[in-house]
Amino acid sequence: MFLLNASRLGAGSRLFSSAGVQFAKKRGQAAKEAVEVDLVDVGDYVKKATERFQHTVELHKKRLGQMKAGKPDATMFDGLAVGNEKQKFTELAATSVKGKNMLIVTVFDPKDTKRVASAIVGAGLNVTTERVLENQQQLKISLPPVTTETRERLCRDMKKVFEEYKNSANRHSLGHVRSEVLKELKKLDKKNDSVRKVIQEIENLHKEYTAMLQEQLKHAEKNAMR
């Protein structure tokens, strides 16, 4: 645990006189302007950063795991936002697997079917969407056949996901987390040894977790090309 003397009121004050620089105050002034000490556990910043970095790695792994070439996945639309209201897909519809390359989306309210279909088409997932004629609340989603081209496209999409979680405006990206933590640390006394050590530790953690993301991407790409 690192303890930082964050601020001292009255410390470092200078009194100039014809006799030179004086570093003492009268007892009455000293009592009035007592030193205020704030103890800050800067080591806690390491703990918080580690927790947030770990959460990012878990989200990245889950996201890559959902990206499977040609394999139907009932959760593939769960992250979509529907309409201008940006409603969660899961609040409006449910998805089930049918056969080797098909999904059935059941919309809870018929009036939302068109909006849900538009969200799926607009997501750029390279799927074919059509209404089930006998049921206006259902959409039939056909997945494309798996080819070398689709596998390579999947790998490119995975790389985009990697970049998003590595360094982007996404509040879960490693870069965003690093910037927020360092911003808070630099409000403290950067000349203090404890603060400098913690800043360096945050930088080292950032590098370690970036390497973890790279390993996850490498593993996902390998599976995609099989």
UniProtKB/Swiss-Prot annotation:
Quick check: keyword Mitochondrion in the entry?
A: yes
Q: Which UniProt keywords apply?
A: Mitochondrion, Protein biosynthesis, Transit peptide
- Gene Ontology, cellular component aspect: mitochondrion
Query: Which Gene3D superfamilies does this UniProt record tie to the protein?
Result: 3.30.1360.40, Ribosome-recycling factor
> Which GO MF terms are attached to this record?
ribosomal large subunit binding
Q: Name one GO biological process term.
A: translation
User: Record's superkingdom?
Assistant: Eukaryota
Give one Pfam family, short name only.
RRF
Tell me where it resides. Answer: Mitochondrion
- Classification via SUPFAM superfamilies: Ribosome recycling factor, RRF
- Which InterPro entries does the entry mention? Ribosome_recyc_fac, Ribosome_recyc_fac_dom, RRF_sf
Q: What biological function has been recorded for the protein in this entry?
A: Necessary for protein synthesis in mitochondria. Functions as a ribosome recycling factor in mitochondria.
The family classification in the record reads: Belongs to the RRF family.
Q: What is this protein called?
A: Ribosome-recycling factor, mitochondrial
**What's the source species' lineage?**
Eukaryota, Fungi, Dikarya, Ascomycota, Saccharomycotina
Q: Which gene encodes it?
A: RRF1
